[in-house]
């Protein structure tokens, strides 16, 4: 039996169907679509206490709580969301949504294309962060939420929070941008391309139309996840957890798994290939690559952020080399140059990029203090 005392408890996903086409940055348009989402807590009378949680690459709408009493795995940010937690559901109404192109209930490549009666597959349009934010705004309209008390996201989710503040300035009171960046570096784009190539060159990928073939490009997904997972960890963190430990205690002088880190990465790859969609992985990494709000302003990030009205909290982690503190400081400097209100914290952690999902005490304390301020502003 799952202990839900400090949790939002048993939750259920909801679906919102939209019949109006969604124009996309690519020039394409997505016809009728569905967004899957979850909510926790209660919306107050003036609907001022709503918080939107934006997920990262492999995330989804199931942010907190459990689906069944015997469920062993809570939502991916359950350590932050719930009664008495930093994002306190006794004070806030929290919304988590699976982005379009995802594989957890919202319309994506594995969904049926109404024009063909077959899965979208390779025909599903490329999505961008602005496309997601537009769809999230439509969901907010559906829920009757005119203004978010806060939009919060880590990594790719932080990019969405940043874009919310630019695209809908009057609808965001606070934007929390965690372990993120205003655009990807060349190195990060390179990592994403290698991961995509692992999938694209898997014979079972079938050009993205593997659903009809009854295959799953597991080899490509495994390799993509293994590569990605390495970049989410830090050298010190990996050394502390695995070092050079051998599974059998001695060298076997072969090419099978010998080191514990090899076993761990293969386990992560195998697990990921069991539930994640290959086309979704491609879409999510491309959305990361394309995000660059400063591009439309001649590379001037401060100019891109000028429309924002929100107060910002930007946080980074010392051991995160995928989205380094330098990238967060770049955002902070641009916000200051644009005359915005911004708080910045660089948190000591050995957990690398994944630290935004962890519970390092300084991080928890930071989130609790900032969200307490947000709650007081809306009398929550």
UniProtKB/Swiss-Prot annotation:
It comes from the Bacteria. Pfam families: Abhydrolase_1. The keyword Cytoplasm applies. Gene3D superfamilies: 1.10.1740.110, alpha/beta hydrolase (3.40.50.1820). It catalyses: L-homoserine + succinyl-CoA = O-succinyl-L-homoserine + CoA. GO terms for biological process: homoserine metabolic process; methionine biosynthetic process. InterPro entries: AB_hydrolase_1, AB_hydrolase_fold, HAT_MetX-like. Homodimer. Transfers a succinyl group from succinyl-CoA to L-homoserine, forming succinyl-L-homoserine. Belongs to the AB hydrolase superfamily. MetX family. This is Homoserine O-succinyltransferase. It comes from Chromobacterium violaceum (strain ATCC 12472 / DSM 30191 / JCM 1249 / CCUG 213 / NBRC 12614 / NCIMB 9131 / NCTC 9757 / MK).
